[in-house]
Amino acid sequence: MGCLHSKTANLPSSDDPSAPNKPESVNGDQVDQEIQNFKEFELNELRKATNGFSPSCIVSEGGEKAPNVVYRGKLEGNHLVAIKRFSRQSWPDAQQFVVEATGVGKLRNKRIVSLIGCCAEGDERLLVAEYMPNDTLSKHLFHWEKQPLPWDMRVRIADYIAEALDYCNIENRKIYHDLNAYRILFDEEGDPRLSTFGLMKNSRDGKSYSTNLAYTPPEFLRTGRVIPESVIFSYGTILLDLLSGKHIPPSHALDIIRGKNALLLMDSSLEGQYANDDATKLVDLASKCLQSEAKDRPDTKFLLSAVAPLQKQEEVASHVLMGLPKNTVILPTMLSPLGKACAKMDLATFHDILLKTGYRDEEGAENELSFQEWTQQVQEMLNTKKFGDIAFRDKDFKNSIEYYSKLVGMMPVPSATVFARRAFSYLMTDQQELALRDAMQAQVCIPEWPTAFYLQALALSKLGMETDAQDMLNDGAAYDAKRQNSWRC
């Protein structure tokens, strides 16, 4: 078959100074290469970017039923963006919407997500912001999969969001609507940033808080109005989230604090990661922020002075603290179904997709007619392939290996699909080295075939080579994106 080559052989070491420190793309699409100047977009441009505002592009909570929906979009030049689509009645005055958006769009700071455009065409009111590829604080704090957020990262989040609020305060943007864990996003380096969408309030519906009323500032419940001190109260609820790792109503938290049981608030997964004195200081700050009287709450400068000294590992990058890969970050939401199955090590789903795909990925390749020729000329070859496919379908991987191995020796032209199926069969029988070899052979047959890279990622992960596995996953995702004639959300 000739010399086998896998990109794992040329992977840079994590200690290699030549290895890139800053991710530059997600699935081959550009993320945050340069912050664009604020502009007014054409509706058709944003419709195209979201595949016609396809439901599959929605990344916000609540899906289509939410009053304001956020989509993932891709502009010309493969720049990923987040597009917020307001309900038709939210901003009846188009000029007011554009003026407000333009004002917010002037804000530029490393602690906030930049608003780069808007659209007010017909009944549509849309905002366009930088795309943050590493999900929300809510996801990392309440719905984590691999590891809970460590203490040092939680302190950093508290510090960076305090910086963001202080910057907005300096720029006379003192009102932030519905500050919660969904409004804190993570960029390509894993740094937390404050969404600028919260700086724009729906002008008609007056709803500044969409979360449970138990978490809203007391003055909002009394008057329906938001004041600068309301933002400090909401920051206090963020501190509670970070301390406890769960949603705790402020009134309940204050009862615990007044009872001198502050450490009972702490997330049990953080045990041994913090000094009690540091935790007590954060709890005390949360208590100050959650005072029922707005005048008793601290300002943003006080937040900074209280939180900044608690950072102990400022020299450690956020992606390291969070356990994110150092190289290109690939989000599950940006992967194809096969890529998602690979990322989750979901072998059952991976098997199902291989079955459904069949041999279609070899169409157009040099060997596309090989099976057709075999079925016409060699009945034994046809039967061997048939029995191998049946065994693979029935998850009889021992026999699928036997039949596919026999078929490999009979094929006049190598088949990437046969190697892929045998590779998966080897994986399912704990023969990872053989699985990796076959996945590499599949790559030789079709050099830019995502399936071959995903199989290598699975095998490398099983072998404990996580860095190399992540690299293969990234490559597979990039080739997945490249293979699309038009972007699918």
Curated annotation (Swiss-Prot):
InterPro entries (UniProt xref): BSK, Kinase-like_dom_sf, Prot_kinase_dom, TPR-like_helical_dom_sf
SUPFAM superfamilies (UniProt xref): Protein kinase-like (PK-like), TPR-like
Every copy of the Protein kinase domain together lies at 56-322
Fetch the Pfam families from UniProt: Pkinase
Q: Which segments show compositional bias classed as Polar residues? A: 7-16
Cellular location(s): Cell membrane
Similarity comment: Belongs to the protein kinase superfamily. Ser/Thr protein kinase family.
Role this protein plays: Probable serine/threonine kinase that acts as a positive regulator of brassinosteroid (BR) signaling downstream of the receptor kinase BRI1. Mediates signal transduction from BRI1 by functioning as substrate of BRI1.
User: Which named protein is this?
Assistant: Serine/threonine-protein kinase BSK2
Q: Which organism is it from?
A: Arabidopsis thaliana
